[in-house]
Design a protein with these regions (language model features):
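Active-site and adjacent substrate-binding regions of carbohydrate-active enzymes
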Residues: 2-518
Length: 518
């Protein structure tokens, strides 16, 4: 099978970008605006706000009537849905896209043929298609319940009496009555629209690998939901059953057919490195997100001191469908600073539909309609500039390093408020980008020694890609004592570094100058 992918890095870039789309909500919007039978074929990719390396289309798989019915009756969920949609109607609740009855494209989305065409259209952009894989559980009405009940964790009458929120009694097609466990993690009650898969059963593991091999022909990568739950130590802690490792064998099986296939893990509990070692290409960086959200700049910087072999596999984000919207968590200027820290670090840069517009209302994966919200033009303008900066070849495929800020004068400790990076071409010691962020609610100052390597010119021109301001600094002073930086609260700068000769040549080419900032 030909996949017609661009001949660059296997994943588009060493530090690729990803855009998550709420497929069903997008389709509902199209259906309400003149195309009532719209499928994946009607999704106009040209309307997307940027060209990304990856597009993750959320919730394309077939779901069932049982999950839909549960979602429409669950009192707690209904409260959440009404907060999102005050005019909530039953048709807005389709059931969770993670309560899957079959890994075939949902019939309401156009089926597998429409999905194949979507993949071709994504490839035509020079991009790649990512879809969901939910390893921990299946929907209650999945065919395996009758065909292979041994694929699921089963319980007893005592289990369901002791924890009715975690078990369900079902009557099979043959008349047998069995008690099944809901899918869950060890810290929360079960997901009541799902059944827990039994990874202690080798036949179940084989069946899941067969699904993965099929999916590898239908997309280019998978975002693996709660991937750490099927690690043997976590599975045994939750269910008291020993199992063999799943991920190394599963990932190896897929990559033996498609070496360029991408596995991205949703993972928490400091298990990122473990899953990277088991074969995952990328793992969620929830720790950086949490530390930025909690304004812990020192802890965030310490996290970024980890080795590049770890950092380059991290997925940096400020929001996704599980988290509150970034514009709710982070005030305007703080969000901009957090975005520069997150997305100028190495790894995958993960953006969420609605993030660029400053949307504030989180949409449950059970819903297929979102609320009307106005666009925050200030946030939109910021992300437009940030995305342009992220298109730079050096930050997509170059080498990254974390820089330290020294005290600007005795007794001034605001240097601890800074996070700074340098980017250079692969194998080069010539810095091309300098990133400086004051992650604090007050003015801060520092000196940042800049390792300019074999830079031969006396003057360095620094062009701020977020403000278009231009600065000239002495190269020797930038080395020692360092570049003096004074920034206001939550202020960030992304500098493009050039020699004075390069800058003058560009001025002559465009026939003018922007002037110099101080």
């Amino acid at each position: 099978m030909s996949h017609n992918l661009p001949p660059k890095s296997p994943f588009g870039a060493r530090n690729p970008s990803l855009y998550q789309l709420n497929t069903r909500v997008w389709l509902t919007d199209i259906r309400q605006n003149g195309a009532p039978k719209a499928t994946l074929d009607e999704l106009d990719l040209s309307t997307l706000p940027h060209r990304f390396d990856w597009y993750w289309f959320l919730s394309v798989w077939q779901t069932g009537e049982t999950g839909q019915s549960i979602s429409r009756q669950h009192p707690g969920w209904l409260q959440e849905f009404r907060r999102t949609l005050p005019d909530l109607a039953e048709r807005d609740i389709a059931g969770s896209g993670f309560a899957i009855t079959a890994y075939s494209c949902h019939k309401d989305l156009g089926g597998n043929a429409a999905l194949a065409r979507l993949k071709d259209r994504v490839h035509a952009l020079g991009s790649r298609l990512m879809l969901d894989f939910v390893p921990n559980h299946m929907a209650i009405d999945h065919p395996w319940v009758n065909e292979h009940p041994d694929y699921f964790i089963q319980g007893t009458a005592d289990d369901i009496a002791a924890a009715p929120q975690n078990y369900i009694a079902l009557t099979l097609d043959n008349g047998d009555q069995k008690i099944f466990a809901h899918g869950r993690d060890p810290y929360f009650d079960g997901w009541c629209d799902t059944l827990q898969l039994d990874y202690a059963n080798p036949a179940l593991q084989d069946a899941m690998i067969a699904i993965l091999l099929d999916l590898a022909d239908r997309c280019d990568g998978l975002r693996c939901d709660m991937a750490m739950l099927v690690l043997p130590e976590i599975f045994e802690r939750t269910w008291g059953r020993a199992s063999e490792p799943f991920w190394p064998r599963a990932i190896a099986a897929v990559k033996s057919r498609r070496p360029d296939f991408c596995f991205m893990a949703e993972v928490y509990w400091d298990l990122e490195w473990e899953l990277q070692q088991q074969g995952f290409d990328y793992t969620y960086d929830k720790r950086l997100y949490d530390r930025l959200r909690e304004r812990q700049v020192h802890a965030a910087r310490e996290h970024l001191y980890a080795g590049i072999d770890y950092q380059k596999h991290m997925v940096r984000f400020l929001e996704n469908h599980d988290e509150a919207r970034a514009s709710v968590i982070f005030p305007h200027e703080m969000q901009k600073a957090a975005a520069v820290i997150s997305y100028l670090a190495p790894g995958m840069r993960f953006f969420h539909q609605g993030q660029f517009e400053g949307k504030r209302i989180k949409i449950s994966p059970h819903l297929v309609r979102g609320p009307e919200e106005s666009v925050d033009q200030n946030i939109r303008a910021f992300y437009a500039g940030l995305l342009e900066a992220l298109d730079g070849e050096v930050v997509r495929n170059g080498d990254w390093r974390l820089l330290a800020g020294n005290s600007a004068w005795q007794g001034n400790f605001t240097n601890e408020d800074f996070i700074a990076y340098a980017w250079s071409a692969p194998g080069s010691d010539i810095i091309e980008r300098l990133v400086v962020v004051n992650y604090a609610p007050h003015h801060s100052q520092c000196y940042i020694p800049i390792p300019l390597g074999n830079y031969q010119q006396n003057v360095v021109v620094l062009k701020d890609q977020l403000s278009d301001r231009i600065y000239e600094r002495n190269a020797w002073q930038m080395r020692d004592p360092g570049l003096y930086v004074e920034l206001g609260p939550w202020q960030a700068q992304i500098f493009k570094l050039e020699s004075a000769l390069q800058s003058q040549a560009q001025k002559q080419t465009v026939g003018g100058s922007n002037g110099h900032g101080r």
